[in-house]
């Protein structure tokens, strides 16, 4: 089992225009996979959404550098567990 560190850039952040009813979202881009990902969340479930991703997808997510307000180039640091 190995670990690969990847930086996911937040391309878009919505706090007012929900992807689905009552949801906001992050759109993030994975350079290593050339793929976009959408992470929906509810305001009161902000960090719970990241913890759910960590459990279900095998990611270790450091959300400490993500604020609820949009910044110029925020990133999510992810560690992917490889079998």
Curated annotation (Swiss-Prot):
Has the keyword Chloroplast been applied to this entry? yes
Domain of life, per lineage: Eukaryota
Subcellular localization(s) per the UniProt record: Plastid, Chloroplast
Swiss-Prot/TrEMBL keywords: Chloroplast, Plastid
> Where is this protein chiefly located?
plastid
A Gene Ontology cellular component where this protein is annotated is:
chloroplast
Recorded protein name is: Uncharacterized 9.7 kDa protein in chlB-trnK intergenic region
């Amino acid at each position: 089992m190995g670990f690969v560190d990847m930086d996911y850039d937040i391309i878009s952040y919505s706090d007012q225009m929900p992807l689905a009813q009552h949801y906001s979202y992050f759109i993030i881009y994975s350079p290593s996979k050339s793929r976009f990902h959408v992470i929906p969340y509810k305001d009161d479930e902000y960090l719970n959404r990241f913890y759910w991703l960590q459990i279900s997808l095998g990611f270790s997510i450091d959300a400490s550098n993500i604020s609820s307000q949009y910044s110029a180039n925020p990133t999510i640091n992810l560690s992917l567990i490889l079998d």
